[in-house]
Amino acid sequence: MRKSISIAFVIAITIFMSHLNVFTVYSLTPCEEATNLLTPCLRYLWAPPEAKPSPECCSGLDKVNKGVKTYDDRHDMCICLSSEAAITSADQYKFDNLPKLCNVALFAPVGPKFDCSTIKV
């Protein structure tokens, strides 16, 4: 008797919770993930010319770079990063130097002026 009440209670709670969408998992798009990973780079991009990127910035850049495997990934991420770069209104020189300063061989140049259609297959 007690066991059947416990099972009924668990079923009732499960049904109730499913109606509340408590178990819904929201995932980020690759662009949103990259934007989150590169947020620490904003301090460098807006800093004086002699500034260096933080370890968190470089780590984020490396993770984004390692996450793009295919041509479509590279092209989509290029569009994402170029759009985000245009919003930051930082100096193109800073974008150009970021991969070098972080020692990351980036899949494509980053910055608001880069033409993503020139990425090679």
Curated annotation (Swiss-Prot):
Gene Ontology molecular functions: lipid binding
Disulfide pattern: 31-80, 41-57, 58-102, 78-116
InterPro entries for the chain: Bifun_inhib/LTP/seed_sf, Bifunc_inhib/LTP/seed_store, Plant_nsLTP
Gene3D superfamilies noted in UniProt: Plant lipid-transfer and hydrophobic proteins
Keywords: Disulfide bond, Lipid-binding, Signal, Transport
Keyword Signal attached: yes
CDD domains found in the cross-reference section: nsLTP1
Extent of the signal sequence: 1-27
Gene Ontology biological process: lipid transport
PANTHER family named in the record: NON-SPECIFIC LIPID-TRANSFER PROTEIN 2-RELATED (PTHR33076)
Known role: Plant non-specific lipid-transfer proteins transfer phospholipids as well as galactolipids across membranes. May play a role in wax or cutin deposition in the cell walls of expanding epidermal cells and certain secretory tissues.
Sequence similarity: Belongs to the plant LTP family.
Protein known as: Non-specific lipid-transfer protein 9
Organism name: Arabidopsis thaliana
Lineage, broadest ranks: Eukaryota, Viridiplantae, Streptophyta, Embryophyta, Tracheophyta
